[in-house]
């Protein structure tokens, strides 16, 4: 039986690359985004998400693999804090992921099968300069997915978290700051799909960035801000 994957946020970047990678491995891939795809979806809108989930079930049946890869990023520092930008990060990244979970997990739980995957970021591991909107939304995603995973540990429903470092995409092309260890979207897709096949709870990459950010968690909070002092 052909395996089915619904990729939400598949128009460009990592989502498009993951869709291509799964397609090359024989998966029946349904691509969704706000502007393109067989099923249009706007994860910042409740009605859009639940309607898209209904369309998917009508056209393709059960949810085998659902990957939520859509997201929002805008650099924002404390000196230029904008509450509306913070809310947009939260509504798209955090609540958007929760909307998708609410739309597909009940069916997965009912059938006791399926895999739900959320794409977060290593930016959620620790507070970073210019990330006062993006970082908190990604930290919330990581915690949310882990909470779901603990709730579903005695079922056959799997929840996986993807936390990339810098990946070359239209989203990162606008960045004017250094992006260490940056990799291509195609390379990222291969790592993600390999992690999906291995059923890893957390897929963190590239390795140098994963190690750096995991070590960063060990730095005392009294010292962490001082690492970013200039001069």
What is each of the regions a protein language model found here?
Residues 69-74:
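Conserved NAD(P)H cofactor-binding loop of Rossmann-fold oxidoreductase domains
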Residues 121:
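Residue(s) in the substrate-gating loop at a strand-loop-helix junction
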Residues 101, 137:
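Active-site helix of classical SDR
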Residues 34-47:
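Rossmann-fold cofactor-recognition segment
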């Amino acid at each position: 039986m052909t395996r089915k994957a619904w990729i939400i946020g598949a128009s460009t970047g990592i989502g498009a690359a993951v869709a291509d990678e799964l397609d090359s491995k024989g998966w029946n891939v349904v691509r969704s985004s706000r502007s393109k795809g067989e099923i249009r979806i706007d994860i910042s809108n409740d009605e859009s998400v639940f309607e898209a989930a209904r369309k998917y079930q009508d056209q393709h049946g059960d949810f085998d693999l659902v990957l939520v890869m859509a997201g929002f990023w805008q650099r924002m520092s404390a000196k230029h804090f904008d509450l509306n930008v913070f809310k947009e990060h939260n509504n798209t990244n955090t609540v958007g992921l929760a909307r998708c979970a609410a739309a597909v997990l009940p069916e997965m739980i009912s059938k006791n099968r399926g895999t739900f995957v959320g794409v977060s970021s290593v930016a959620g591991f620790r507070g970073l300069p210019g990330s006062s909107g993006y970082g908190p939304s990604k930290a919330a995603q990581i915690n949310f997915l882990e909470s779901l995973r603990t709730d579903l540990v005695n079922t056959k429903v799997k929840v996986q978290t993807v936390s990339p470092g810098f990946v070359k995409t239209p989203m990162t092309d606008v960045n004017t700051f250094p992006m260490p260890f940056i990799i291509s979207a195609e390379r990222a897709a291969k790592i993600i799909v390999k992690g999906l096949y291995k059923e890893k709870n957390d897929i963190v990459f590239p390795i140098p960035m994963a190690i750096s950010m995991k070590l960063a968690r060990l730095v005392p909070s009294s010292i962490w801000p001082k690492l970013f002092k200039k001069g």
